[in-house]
Amino acid sequence: MNNQIIKINDIELANNKPFVLFGGINVLESRDLAMRVAEHYVEVTTKLNIPYVFKASFDKANRSSINSYRGPGLDEGLKIFEEIKKTFNIPLITDVHEPHQAAPVAEVVDVIQLPAFLARQTDLVVAMAKTGAIINVKKPQFLAPHEMRHIITKFNEAGNNNVALCERGSSFGYNNLVVDMLGMDDMKVMAPVIFDATHALQRPGGRADSADGRRAQAAELARSGMALGIAGLFIEAHPNPNEAKCDGPCALALSKLEGYLTQMKAVDDLIKSFAPLDTSASDL
């Protein structure tokens, strides 16, 4: 297992440390909603003593339909991020889609996310690496876990060694994702691993013009991932998931956040209390 520690301000992200929550809302729908969601996450994570990084997107550039809501855009999004950071004194994570976005985002945001569909775009990788920001790489649905080494190497060769990997499911036929738990465990050899338990619930293209999801199984899937002993958990919640402008079918209801995280913390604490157990030996 890779026990590299990535420092996000005073937070330690590592496979053998207490898990870090990367949580928030899928896309910035409005300033007021983002502030409300951030405040609730801060209250719950403070109560449960869970290290916390706020997540939202300023632009959803890969929507199924050209008519789908994308977000407020870079400039307005960064203003909202700055207010959240100043108000709650928390680190932030967001995704970028084009090389020119990397530098301005890194001036405000602590962790930059490389989207799964863009994970092999070398120009984007290099631009992100050069900011010196912490990087979260979403594993593409179409790549094997061992292939993530190549993406890490790109970042390293471009001068950035603070790279985490994020599992979000693998394509399993049409309109379906499955999570390869052994594959996620294999990635722990390469870097700190984060589990995106929200987007792993997706049924891509499952609706006429958007993705469907399996919110009812959010706790089951997340508990399974936490049982691997990982560095972080990535989730999205919404006050009214059925009214969310993106990925509502996968989002947790905000009112369920405390109970959900209480379970995840209990699993993480239990798993990381065990002594290492080597089952590779073949002797009797």
UniProtKB/Swiss-Prot annotation:
HAMAP family per the UniProt record, alphabetical: KDO8P_synth (MF_00056)
Gene: kdsA
GO BP terms in the entry: keto-3-deoxy-D-manno-octulosonic acid biosynthetic process
Gene3D superfamilies: Aldolase class I (3.20.20.70)
EC top class, as a word: transferase
Gene Ontology terms, MF aspect: 3-deoxy-8-phosphooctulonate synthase activity
Chief place where the protein resides: cytoplasm
Cellular localization per UniProt: Cytoplasm
UniProt similarity note: Belongs to the KdsA family.
InterPro entries named among the record's database cross-references: Aldolase_TIM, DAHP1/KDSA, KDO8P_synthase
Source superkingdom: Bacteria
Name under which the protein is recorded: 2-dehydro-3-deoxyphosphooctonate aldolase
Pathway the protein contributes to: Carbohydrate biosynthesis; 3-deoxy-D-manno-octulosonate biosynthesis; 3-deoxy-D-manno-octulosonate from D-ribulose 5-phosphate: step 2/3; Bacterial outer membrane biogenesis; lipopolysaccharide biosynthesis
Record NCBIfam families: KDO8P_synth (TIGR01362), PRK05198.1 (NF003543), PRK12457.1 (NF009109)
Alphabetically ordered keywords of this record: Cytoplasm, Lipopolysaccharide biosynthesis, Transferase
EC number: 2.5.1.55
Gene Ontology CC: cytoplasm
Catalytic activity: D-arabinose 5-phosphate + phosphoenolpyruvate + H2O = 3-deoxy-alpha-D-manno-2-octulosonate-8-phosphate + phosphate
